[in-house]
Regions:
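Amphipathic alpha-helical polymerization modules
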Residues: 1-140
Length: 140
């Protein structure tokens, strides 16, 4: 009976460890999403700043803007947009890869926790029967 109790306690400890790991992974997932959101905001702010500088450059030129100047400004704006679009896509790809990795760990752990729960329940039933049998034996 003592071995049964020790086994149950070991399983309970194992389950608690896995659940704590799952909570850490969930927190890591939230932190990853928050960090990604903050980085996206920074990238978009940088893009806005660069576009504003180009706009100032255009506004600071003489009263009349030549077609070449206007075309050059449009090209700069297009380059800026492409640069920051690429930065955002790279960030999203990294974030999604990290999220998938964390979610896979969480998902892989779930069946183990369920299996340990089932084992604990089965061992508890065995312990209950054994305790009941001992009690009955001692009463007779």
């Amino acid at each position: 009976m003592l071995n049964l109790l020790l086994t149950i306690l070991t399983y309970v400890d194992l389950r608690a460890t896995w659940q704590a790991d799952a909570m850490k992974d969930s927190q890591m997932l939230q932190d990853t999403q928050l960090q990604s959101s903050n980085e996206q905001t920074q990238i978009m702010q940088q893009q806005t700043n660069e576009e504003a500088l180009v706009q100032l450059e255009l506004e600071g030129s003489e009263d009349s803007v030549s077609t070449e100047q206007y075309t050059a400004v449009l090209q700069k704006m297009s380059q800026i947009a492409a640069k920051f679009e690429s930065l955002l896509q790279n960030l999203m790809a990294k974030t999604q890869a990290k999220e998938r990795e964390i979610e896979q760990r969480i998902t892989a752990r779930e069946p183990k926790i369920k299996a340990v729960d089932a084992d604990i329940e089965s061992l508890q039933e065995t312990l209950d029967k054994s305790t009941e049998e001992q009690f009955t034996y001692m009463q007779s």
